[in-house]
Swiss-Prot record:
It comes from the Eukaryota. Belongs to the universal ribosomal protein uS8 family. Its main location: plastid. This is Small ribosomal subunit protein uS8c.
Length: 129
């Protein structure tokens, strides 16, 4: 049993990218589905499908002949031992807006751009670039 499903998800994606795997199976949780949906919407992965009540299947995305991963770095910001919260004015920009920060708000999980547009603050979950 994993205590932190977000860190587990990010680590599995990072490790699969390092060995250039096409598909990845992860545990099916609501948070995992939301993060994968945002990764798909932002263009970091090809697809996310529900295999069963316990599994999600991710199709990872690579660029060019060298098959460079679309995800350069995944970083967990708010951890179970140290939660990080920010108002919409203080949500950090990653690589001057080239990267994406996922924010857990009262309206659900969303990207930093969407949270700033809706003027919602919340917990800074992770960053992707």
């Amino acid at each position: 049993m994993v205590n932190d499903c977000i860190s587990d998800l990010l680590t599995r994606i990072r490790n699969a990218n390092l060995v250039k795997k096409e598909k990845l199976i992860i545990p099916n949780t609501r948070v995992s589905r939301n993060i994968c949906a945002l990764l798909e919407k932002e263009g970091f992965i090809d697809s996310c499908q529900v295999n069963s009540t316990e599994e999600l299947a991710l199709q990872l995305k690579y660029k060019g002949r060298e098959r460079k991963p679309c995800i350069t770095n995944l970083r967990r910001i708010s951890k179970p031992g140290l939660r990080i919260y920010a108002s919409y004015k203080n949500i950090p920009k990653i690589l001057n807006g080239m990267g994406v920060v996922f924010v857990s708000t009262s309206q659900g999980l969303m990207t930093d751009r969407e949270a700033r547009y809706r003027k919602l603050g919340g917990e800074i979950v992770c960053s992707v670039w």
